[in-house]
Amino acid sequence: MTHQAADPFTRHDWTLSEIIEIYKSPLLELIARANAIHREFHDVNDVQKASLLSIKTGGCPENCGYCPQSAHHKEVHLDRIHMMKPDEVLEIAARAKAAGADRFCMGAAWRSVRDGREFDSVIEMVRGVRELGLEACVTLGMLNAAQAGRLKEAGLTAYNHNLDTGPDYYDKIVTTRSYDDRLDTLKAVRGAGIEMCCGGIVGMGESVADRAAMLQTLARFDPHPESVPINALVPVEGTPLGERERIDPLEFVRMIAVTRIVLPASRVRLSAGRSVLNREAQVLCMVAGANSIFYGEQLLTTPNVGETDDDALFAALAPQCQLKDALPTD
């Protein structure tokens, strides 16, 4: 069951102190509470599989401290990929559908969408993906209402644009784009009637209050974001955050549980950083409310859990566990 009707769980008026109190509650109690809410809103055996295809890699003018695609981080060794052609992308999409996919996600390392040939190519990709009978999702940076309208007209299902962290910690991570810029993009997405995919990253040095503030911001959207990716920082050598220690797995489980409580109807997606979780920790995340994973050995430019390992994980969970496939990265 998935719904956002008026109920005792769905709220848009969470206070920061309320979310922090939930976050600091005993872990077993927290997981039990999150699981009860998860069962109220979702089929626990419905776990979506989604993957990202980078249609343009590297050279981004933003200075996000975690991202190897930033042109500011000169010491990062990254193979840049120029914009893929629509026929290349649609060939991969067709193979994905033949393998049972139902959603195809495309990401471009842009600061913002610019009208012109490349955006026209993305529109062509979205139309082609929809004509194949697949859902289409893109992450392209900032965009305005008119551009969101074009994507909606082309049939776009969802737009990903993460907040990254809470507003008070945001400028410690990126200074080339403001928090309000991100919120304006999300408003344009919602205004066009496109599903919102928006979450953040934990393990960047932020406080519990910063994590809570990010969730509070997401909860203010009415309705809540349809999907919320929660990423654990993957430190990449050469980036400003490249020397940070990885987040403790149980702390990541805690974040998943709080996200499920604050955003009960959203699909909570285990995203970057899942590769360092053993399968028991991943299952605990699902008990705590995660009901989507990114599938494939790479997420844009960072490593992910291998497909064979994921297949074995879900075979162990339950024969009836339903996996809604998205594109395996090429």
UniProtKB/Swiss-Prot annotation:
* SMART domains noted in UniProt: BATS, Elp3
Hey, which pathway is this one from?
Answer: Cofactor biosynthesis; biotin biosynthesis; biotin from 7,8-diaminononanoate: step 2/2
Pfam families in alphabetical order:
BATS, Radical_SAM
Name one process (GO BP) from the record: biotin biosynthetic process
Keyword Transferase in the entry? The reply is yes
Cofactor note (record): Binds 1 [4Fe-4S] cluster. The cluster is coordinated with 3 cysteines and an exchangeable S-adenosyl-L-methionine.
Q: For [2Fe-2S] cluster, which residues are the binding ones?
A: 105, 137, 197, 269
Which residues take part in binding [4Fe-4S] cluster?
60, 64, 67
Give the main EC class. Answer: transferase
Where's the Radical SAM core domain? 45-274
GO MF annotation, one: biotin synthase activity
The reactions it catalyses are: (4R,5S)-dethiobiotin + (sulfur carrier)-SH + 2 reduced [2Fe-2S]-[ferredoxin] + 2 S-adenosyl-L-methionine = (sulfur carrier)-H + biotin + 2 5'-deoxyadenosine + 2 L-methionine + 2 oxidized [2Fe-2S]-[ferredoxin]
Q: Which UniProt keywords apply?
A: 2Fe-2S, 4Fe-4S, Biotin biosynthesis, Iron, Iron-sulfur, Metal-binding, S-adenosyl-L-methionine, Transferase
Task: State which Enzyme Commission number(s) the record gives.
Answer: 2.8.1.6
Q: Which cofactor does it need?
A: [4Fe-4S] cluster; [2Fe-2S] cluster
Provide the function of this protein: Catalyzes the conversion of dethiobiotin (DTB) to biotin by the insertion of a sulfur atom into dethiobiotin via a radical-based mechanism.
Q: How does this polypeptide assemble, per the annotation?
A: Homodimer.
Question: What family name appears in the similarity comment?
Answer: Belongs to the radical SAM superfamily. Biotin synthase family.
State the HAMAP family in the record.
Answer: BioB
Name the UniProt record assigns to this protein: Biotin synthase
- The protein's gene is named bioB
